[in-house]
Amino acid sequence: VKNENTLSRTEEKLVEMSNGCICCTLREDLMIEVEKLAKAQKFDYLIIESTGISEPIPVAQTFSFESEDGSIDLSRFSYVDTMVTVVDAFNFLKDFSSPQYLKDRNLTDIEGDERTIVNLLTDQVEFANVILLNKTDMVTESDLRNLYDIINKLNPDARIIPTNHSKVNLQEVINTGLFDFEKAESSAGWIKELENEHIPETEEYGIGSFVYRRKKPFHPNRFLDFIQHTFPKNIIRSKGLFWIASRPDQALVWSSAGGSLKTDPAGVWWDSMPFSERINYADFVNNQQMIESEWSSDFGDRKIELVFIGQQLDVSAITKKLDECLLNQEEVSEWKDGRLQLTDNWPVSN
């Protein structure tokens, strides 16, 4: 590693991927300089240090992005070897419980950037192969073990290395061969829970997890009230799909991390369209057997599937609270007949 070698300055350009999202905008100048360095054949490895507010997935995508005219294709001479995230052991838990947005701390000047601190931290931890747990000299041994267990639960596959001043043996972060895009996308602890790869609870600090699965819909008002007023503070991370009775066709994705809770549209359920329309979608055709094996005569493929990761979780109490948010049997009967009167105050587009 030679400190005197730096990227030359170029006119900065942006390459926007097809969906036009901010987080999928790639820097063309980075691509050009990486190609120059590779063709110079002077270096074996390139270490790219992103800003603290950058998301890891677009960085990885840069190395698999190919322009339509074929002029940009980094995969011809480079690949991602390791994704490393540095965690500030002293501030992580405080930041993780913060409801603040990046703009609240003047960390972004991108118009329309509505990312929260905790969601960014979660993305960076869940996508990493190696996590440097830095500033370990500034926390107690007990807090360090607790933090280690939390991070391990968020990303069970990552190597967690305690450091001070981010000093680490280069062999831990270079030429590891650890990165695989598909594996990285499914390395998060909540995904492993959904796929029935249960991670054992850490007994000392009670970092545990469970999956809540139901077919019946949530009552829109009762579930919203649960989220706004009684959502357990000891839940560190939760994510999954759900549906509410007032929107039978719409699938919703739920996500919480620390002090941030959000819900977004996730498309429609297959049962909301006739079979003749479903078979026009590759996602349905390729997964038809699995989808139909889980089909319900009452609700089709609609389901609630939420993963909860937290500390000292009272699974039975949380399950009871969630069950109380579901339509009861009388309400289900009225709902099927179109007699159930529902109001919908969810701040999510329908």
Regions found by a protein language model. Give the residues of each.
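Nucleotide-state-sensitive switch-loop elements of NTP-binding domains
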Residues: 1-119
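Residue-level signature of catalytic and energy-coupling elements of molecular machines
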Residues: 30, 49, 83, 128, ...
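Short amphipathic alpha-helices in soluble, non-transmembrane regions
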Residues: 226-229, 318-326
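Alpha-helical scaffold elements adjacent to nucleotide-binding pockets in ATP/GTP-utilizing enzyme cores
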Residues: 29, 33-36, 58-62, 127, ...
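C-terminal structured domain segments
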Residues: 303-307, 323
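Helix N-cap motif at beta-to-alpha junctions
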Residues: 311-315
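Alpha-helical elements of the RecA-like P-loop NTPase motor core of helicases
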Residues: 57, 221, 316
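C-terminal accessory "lid"/substrate-recognition subdomains
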Residues: 92, 98-304, 329-350
